[in-house]
Amino acid sequence: MVFLLCFFLVADVSYGINGDCELPKVVGPCRASHPRYYYNSSSKRCEKFIYGGCRGNANNFHTLEECEKVCGVRSRDSPKEN
């Protein structure tokens, strides 16, 4: 019984979240100004940020829709603009 409870708790927390979505937002050191979206694991939303153009990571999406699809976010939970 305890095993099943633990299994469902872990499954509920991790459902729909791609590992890349847990990476931190990385603006990068370059000075370009590309509007992008990243998954904020604290707010559990896709949020807008300005990407510098280099040395980012996989938590960097061209559109809100792409971020929500990859990271399993429901549309009503987004967007939050920064």
Curated annotation (Swiss-Prot):
Keyword Disulfide bond: yes
GO cellular component: extracellular region; nematocyst
Superkingdom classification of source: Eukaryota
GO MF: potassium channel regulator activity; serine-type endopeptidase inhibitor activity; toxin activity
Principal location: secreted
Record carries keyword Signal: yes
Gene3D superfamilies attached to this UniProt entry: Pancreatic trypsin inhibitor Kunitz domain
Site keyed Reactive bond: positions: R31, A32
Alphabetical keyword list: Disulfide bond, Ion channel impairing toxin, Nematocyst, Potassium channel impairing toxin, Protease inhibitor, Secreted, Serine protease inhibitor, Signal, Toxin, Voltage-gated potassium channel impairing toxin
Span of domain BPTI/Kunitz inhibitor: 21-71
Propeptide stretches in the record: 76-82
Compartments it resides in: Secreted; Nematocyst
Annotated disulfide bonds: C21-C71, C30-C54, C46-C67
Listed PROSITE patterns: BPTI_KUNITZ_1, BPTI_KUNITZ_2
Signal peptide: 1-16
Entry's family note: Belongs to the venom Kunitz-type family. Sea anemone type 2 potassium channel toxin subfamily.
Summary of the function given for this chain in its UniProt record: Serine protease inhibitor that inhibits both tissue and plasma kallikreins. Has hemolytic activity. Inhibits voltage-gated potassium channels (Kv).
Official protein name in the record: U-actitoxin-Avd3j
Species for this entry: Anemonia viridis
Lineage per the UniProt record: Eukaryota, Metazoa, Cnidaria, Anthozoa, Hexacorallia
